[in-house]
Amino acid sequence: MIAVIGEKPSVARDIARILGASEKQDGYLSGNGYLVTWAFGHLVGLAMPEAYGIQSFRRESLPIIPDSFQLTPRQVKAEKGYKADPGALKQLKVIKEVFDQSDKIIVATDAGREGELIFRYIYQYIGCNKPFVRLWISSLTDKSIREGLQNLKAGSLYDNLFLSAQARSEADYLIGINGTQALSVAAGQGIFSLGRVQSPTLAMICTRFLENKNFVPQKYWQLKLQTTKDNVTFTALSTEKYDMQQPAIDTLQRIKEAETVQVKTVERKEVNQEPPLLYDLTTLQKEANTKLNFSADKTLSIAQKLYEGKLISYPRTGSRYISQDVFEEIPERLVNLEQYTRFGGYAAGMKGKALNSRSVNDGKVTDHHALIVTENLPDKMEADEQAIYELIAGRMLEAFSEKCVKDVTSVTLECAGSLFTVKGSVIKSAGWRAVFGEKEDGEDNAALPAMQDGDSLPLSGIELLEKQTKPKPLHTESCLLSSMETAGKELENADLKASMKDTGIGTPATRAAIIETLFSRQYIVREKKNLVPTEKGLAVYNIIRDKKIADVEMTGMWENTLAKIESGEMNPDTFRKGIEVYARQITAELLDVQLSFVSGSGCICPKCKTGRILFYPKVAKCSNVDCSVTIFRNKSDKQLTDKQITELVTTGKTGLIKGFKSKNGKVFDASLAFDEQFNVTFVFPEKKGKPKK
């Protein structure tokens, strides 16, 4: 018997169908000599501190650094702490039984770092030692699965991939557990999540927000001249930008006395615009955020659905290139797109033409090639799925199309001793840009009239423009993904820049989840398309901004090391020792922090309706300094929780709270409510009357 394990039931069923394993069993399919089972994502993970006999959120327990990591079935929240997920336990039992009945295993989890980790953790946890081989494919079409099954890879080829995934998993555990617990212990109330990648990402958002908020615009002035040639009127801007208004006014007056404008230089050149590279996941997420206002997480979710629907290749890719053998299949894919309504005409026009090979490079294909559509055409799709599919299909058409050719004319004019410039652009051959027909910034200029050096033109107008400098815009998800992807540009060390360019902060597969974590922790919110830190997020940032845990350069070093483990250049034990030292350092830094923590409840003040309720260690009060709403946390010897205060603020009354203590020591139960002046008062439960006889 041969066992096969997929990452999800849907994928396992497709593989089982192709293998002829059609008999349904409890948790697996059988037939034709195969037993095909599945995981539900991460069934096994690293054990929580309590599994090692360590009490969490105790100063004396930190740092938490196990001698060796224990694996445990996936955990779910219970009334007290966590417990094993019953569904995970059941499926792990099935997997063990399937493996025990088999002579070897075909690993068909996702062909990537996390897919490898999912299988290896299960394999270790159930104590299996059967030999295994790897199904490594980039799409889930029947053709791709069949070819993959005929070309199974030795499992040992992916040992370094697993070691890198394991090292990343353990590093995230050590930094996340210790950072979160140390800051929470120092704060004295609440849970404040930190992470190896999460914290530098929060720092990037907060840094940009504060730069934008504290930016002081500077005024400057520029002159705009108007002239005419061959009945075509156009304008040009002065090359000089004036910091002071008076010199600009003086120049304006001088030019007003002139009658003509001299053509100083005319530069004409043909510009060839190469087509864009194919999408990797991050580039797709950026484009979908800009054009469709989709979050990174939403885009990944839709792409995963299209992948499982056999319509696109593996989405969690970090490459924008395809290999030569995949390139040979592209003409067939383009013929298929002739039947797709939106792109049919354009795809038909590419038939017989030489395809652009800019996106073809065997040396730049990583675990998976760039995103492309498969040979399967979609039947019915939801609107959001269609939008993402069309981005990928359209980009594929662009990538293999001809260059866009433009005529660009740059003219320098002189008037009364001042220089002005204007640029015109005309598309001669649209090439790849005909796919979507979109204009680029600065292409609204009509073609400039023909001019030569020395031409004299009439001055038909001059005006003074008052402008001001602008701050860097707030981060959108699109520009944050760019910052995460190319954070190395902010570094001074050349070697680190190179490593960060390749690996960045996080990975293509994890960046969306990191951003979503910041939302779920209430560290950031969306304001239109912008990502804005909350009071809680800013408070955390103010604590960690000069600490190692928020250091982009340090994160880059770890990413570089993880990449070296994957390539076999670095021993994972060396990495582990370094991470342990790092965990001890950040724990010590955070435990030494002296702070009075303020976090935002997100609740509008019920009295003034303009401020927001802020949580402090001893009180909660309105952010509006002119408002008097204050709620003391300690009420009659009972410490109020954030949840109880939030309920009071939002509804005007809490549920029944047990355990208040009067001045004479008597324990009583009551609700809390606001009176007409928004003071907090007790509301006692109605006493049940004695039944009538």
Pin down the residues of each PLM region.
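Conserved short loop/turn motifs at secondary-structure junctions
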Residues: 1-3, 110-111, 188-193, 268-277, ...
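C-terminal or mid-to-C-terminal helical accessory/interaction module adjacent to the motor/catalytic core
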Residues: 87, 93, 100-101, 140-227, ...
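Intrinsically disordered, low-complexity regulatory segments
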Residues: 1-169, 179, 471
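Metal- or metallocofactor-binding catalytic centers and their adjacent structured scaffolds
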Residues: 243-279, 285
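Amphipathic alpha-helical transducer elements in NTP-driven molecular machines
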Residues: 9-16, 33-36, 40, 59-62, ...
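Basic, low-complexity terminal or inter-domain segments flanking catalytic cores
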Residues: 2, 81, 125, 180, ...
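Short strand-coil-strand connectors
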Residues: 30-32, 226-230, 414-418, 664
